Amino acid sequence: MIMAKPLSSRRAAPLAGSAPVPGDKSISHRALMLGALAVGESVVTGLLEGDDVLRTAACMRALGAEVERRDDGSWRLFGRGVGGLMEPADVLDMGNSGTGARLLMGLVATHPFTCFFTGDGSLRSRPMRRVIDPLSRMGARFVSRDGGRLPLAVTGTAQPTPITYELPVASAQVKSAIMLAGLNTAGETTVIEREATRDHTELMLRNFGATVRVEDAEGGGRAITVVGFPELTGRPVVVPADPSSAAFPVVAALLVEGSEIRLPNVGTNPLRTGLYQTLLEMGADIRFDHPRDQAGEPVADLVVRSSRLKGVDVPAERAPSMIDEYPILAVAAAFAEGTTRMRGLGELRVKESDRLAAMARGLAACGVAVEEEKDALIVHGTGRIPDGDATVTTHFDHRIAMSFLVMGMASARPVAVDDSEAIDTSFPAFVELMNGLGAKISGDNP
């Protein structure tokens, strides 16, 4: 039986210092997968060594690639070339990683062998039909639990069919799964997205040598086309700090009076920075120093000072660029003066937990006035410090856990989370980093 790891967060003194945020989770997954498909050696530095990404590394080994961590902390991959993956001898256990599972399903769907996927209880409850449907149209066969849930078996096709597929919901994971399947497919595979989603797959594929076209789609949006059978060439990849992980110390510094922190080398891809745009609209003092390009991705050093925030209306169309950041935005909204309305959040219902419900319940327990709607969260801030004094159920969701630990840093009384184990999936050093800046997070009872 897995033992829970409760944590408590107490009101902090002003936060100060510089802290390295871990590598971007989305880019880390993709670097391992494309390095495994490339011809020759790829060296990845800055890889996120959280559980989700380590599961992907283990899966790429199981599929025949050479993957090793070097003494200097970098990762070396020697790939098998497009179409060269091998049938794994065992089940691919994705743990809690929805990104890893969906992208790998695309990767193996156009290889002529069978793979078995499983995951933890949370992942086994998440919908996979959105990936299964387009990959089936390309020729892959699936056997799954009801609703397309894990565990499932994928039998790839030896003669995949290129498709043009319009995403029914904005999803970078589904888009990327189809593009990865398209690499080992003759001709051109096209994904149409009406709302732009994070484009790390497109950027990294080009960086490895694939032909990827991004054009305006008829009727609006973008058409992304990948040309099959490219010769991907091994190359160095530098993974920037994850803007989704940086969100937690950023919001903490905004809320704890007198704080000033610096976060170096944070990814600033415009399709990932919706939270930062929203915080600036709320009155946040965030500076983006030394903007630069790093292996095809924009990065900057973030300087954050404590700020008085005001409530705002967050447009629904911003959701794809900040879908993982709504929990921590809701915490910021709880300290703001005025009402913050967040809409277009239906996708939060099928994340690691029902994040919409989890945030509403947690905020209410901390004394915050909040309304939960079908696809919206409305937080009524008063400009006063929330009471806190609650233990929040995380539902084994790393972002729920970290969000409420940040809340405890600025609330009148401590906030505890019932289990912090899931934090290791994306931010293993979270407690150490936050306490190093001045937080008071511990395993003691509040």
Swiss-Prot record:
Pfam families: EPSP_synthase
SS bonds (residue pairs): none
Region (Disordered): 1-20
Amino-acid biosynthesis keyword on record: yes
PROSITE patterns: EPSP_SYNTHASE_1, EPSP_SYNTHASE_2
GO biological process: amino acid biosynthetic process; aromatic amino acid family biosynthetic process; chorismate biosynthetic process
Positions of transmembrane segments: none
GO CC term (a single one): cytoplasm
Subcellular location: Cytoplasm
A GO MF label: 3-phosphoshikimate 1-carboxyvinyltransferase activity
Active site annotation, chain numbering: 324
Binding residue positions for phosphoenolpyruvate: 25, 98, 126, 173, 355, 399
Sequence positions that bind 3-phosphoshikimate: 25-26, 30, 171, 173, 324, 351
Gene3D superfamilies attached to this UniProt entry: Enolpyruvate transferase domain
Predominant place of localization: cytoplasm
Keywords: Amino-acid biosynthesis, Aromatic amino acid biosynthesis, Cytoplasm, Transferase
Pathway connected to this protein: Metabolic intermediate biosynthesis; chorismate biosynthesis; chorismate from D-erythrose 4-phosphate and phosphoenolpyruvate: step 6/7
Catalysed transformations (reactions): 3-phosphoshikimate + phosphoenolpyruvate = 5-O-(1-carboxyvinyl)-3-phosphoshikimate + phosphate
Top EC class for this record: transferase
Catalytic activity, EC: 2.5.1.19
Role played: Catalyzes the transfer of the enolpyruvyl moiety of phosphoenolpyruvate (PEP) to the 5-hydroxyl of shikimate-3-phosphate (S3P) to produce enolpyruvyl shikimate-3-phosphate and inorganic phosphate.
Quaternary assembly: Monomer.
Family membership: Belongs to the EPSP synthase family.
Protein name: 3-phosphoshikimate 1-carboxyvinyltransferase
